[in-house]
Amino acid sequence: MTTDSSPAPVRELLSVAMVTLGCARNEVDSEELAGRLEADGFRLVQDPAEADTVVVNTCGFVEAAKKDSVDTLLQAADLKARSEQGQGRTRAVVAVGCLAERYGKDLAASLPEADAVFGFDDYPDIAARLRSIVAGEAHEAHTPHDRRTLLPITPVERVLSTTPVPGHASGPASVRRRLDDGPTAALKLASGCDRRCSFCAIPAFRGSFLSRRPSDVLQEARWLADHGARELFLVSENSTSYGKDLGDLRLLETLLPELAAVDGVERVRVSYLQPAETRAGLIEAIASTPGVAPYFDLSFQHASAPVLRRMRRFGDPESFLALLAQVRGHAPAAGVRSNVIVGFPGETEQDLETLCDFLVAARLDVTGVFGYSDEDGTEAATYDGKLDDDEIRARVEHVSDLVEELTSQRAAERLGEQVEVLVERVEDGPGGRTVEGRAAHQGPEVDGATYLLDSDARVGDLVRAVVVGSEGADLDARPL
């Protein structure tokens, strides 16, 4: 009997750049993919021009996001084209993420510049898939389908499913690799959504609502803290539903103090609360648990009851204002942000006025304003009463102007208020030292920043300060 003593072939050391578009949930997915790739021997680089392979984690939420994703893929393809002329090193461009999952073969056919389109089911084997593309092998993109059909109907049984869920990987060590060294990190509570808002396609490609086990969330929280995270930003499509498929709808109230107690974590922040599901116990937990930011990301979407009913949502100005009163009864200085959709099919001028009156009364810190656009496969796309694009743009401009004024007013109301600022950027320049961070009422990237005056703080410090000025949503504060 003879044995083959020849050495195993040495795999080529490949570099990869992850380009992430869209929301914080996508950031988590990118870091999971990065962890899988690094574990398989890929070298991670930041600059796509310096990478052998470019993986673009796309967003497929609204039309503008889709365009941005396609443009980014084309830019990466330009790098590959230049390398083929001896002016670079890029050898493969791959699309992943929501746009890739949502359109699959259709995206691959319409965008031949991308070497492959990977769906969520490809994520566990991303390294092998990517190596095969670099080796010149073809990859057949998936046929798009409704991912809600992949999980059991009974919520409690969903945790037993073997269907890959991006951002839910767990085990003895976190399957994740941080792509920046900032003090804030997103942490997934759940994926998918069981609600059926008429304008939203997300459940079709993200699937039914699936909570992560608390032990997995806590394990990843500890890992993030060990890797420099000081604020944990809890993300999902609907955080108020966390635990319902685990048999405990109040699980988030239990989990929050445990997360806040993780060594090294200074602050925990919850995102995306569905107003119709925001219960009194959860409000109290967010408002009063030490280490949890009194921050309420309430997605109202509109205030007119008729419009909300057409959206397959619930509420009206009175119930929303009562909810805000409940929040501020527990935490008067709580941060509250929201998003609204303007120009929804059938929206009348009276509906628009109702929305504007509500925004004035609500005193929100920040409001995102979006113009309605049809999304493939949604109920709203079939509705009558569509407004023309010019009218939608005019309404968006009107509401945006109002929101800009209201945001400035709300920030000015915080003058003299004491805040705790997590420092995220320190820069020395000709004009002096800039120390930028966020107070408890300011979420990452979308809610403005707080600038510390005459401060020697470092990135990651939590500084107590008093607000002395404001501009838009931004604040100036002096350390105490």
From Swiss-Prot:
A GO MF label: aspartic acid methylthiotransferase activity
GO cellular component terms, alphabetically, are: cytosol
Residues binding [4Fe-4S] cluster 1: 23, 59, 98
What reaction does this enzyme carry out catalytically?
A: L-aspartate(89)-[ribosomal protein uS12]-hydrogen + (sulfur carrier)-SH + AH2 + 2 S-adenosyl-L-methionine = 3-methylsulfanyl-L-aspartate(89)-[ribosomal protein uS12]-hydrogen + (sulfur carrier)-H + 5'-deoxyadenosine + L-methionine + A + S-adenosyl-L-homocysteine + 2 H(+)
Disulphide connectivity of cysteines: none
Record key words, sorted:
4Fe-4S, Cytoplasm, Iron, Iron-sulfur, Metal-binding, S-adenosyl-L-methionine, Transferase
Annotated source species: Nocardioides sp. (strain ATCC BAA-499 / JS614)
Could you tell me where this protein is found in the cell?
Cytoplasm
Protein role? Catalyzes the methylthiolation of an aspartic acid residue of ribosomal protein uS12.
What top-level branch of life does the organism fall under?
A: Bacteria
Family per UniProt?
Belongs to the methylthiotransferase family. RimO subfamily.
One biological process term in Gene Ontology: tRNA modification
Domain Radical SAM core: from-to ranges? 179-410
Instruction: Identify the CDD domains for this entry.
Output: Radical_SAM (cd01335)
Q: Which SMART domains match?
A: Elp3
Q: Is the Cytoplasm keyword given for this protein?
A: yes
The cofactor note reads:
Binds 2 [4Fe-4S] clusters. One cluster is coordinated with 3 cysteines and an exchangeable S-adenosyl-L-methionine.
The molecule here is called Ribosomal protein uS12 methylthiotransferase RimO
Q: Which residues form the MTTase N-terminal domain?
A: 14-135
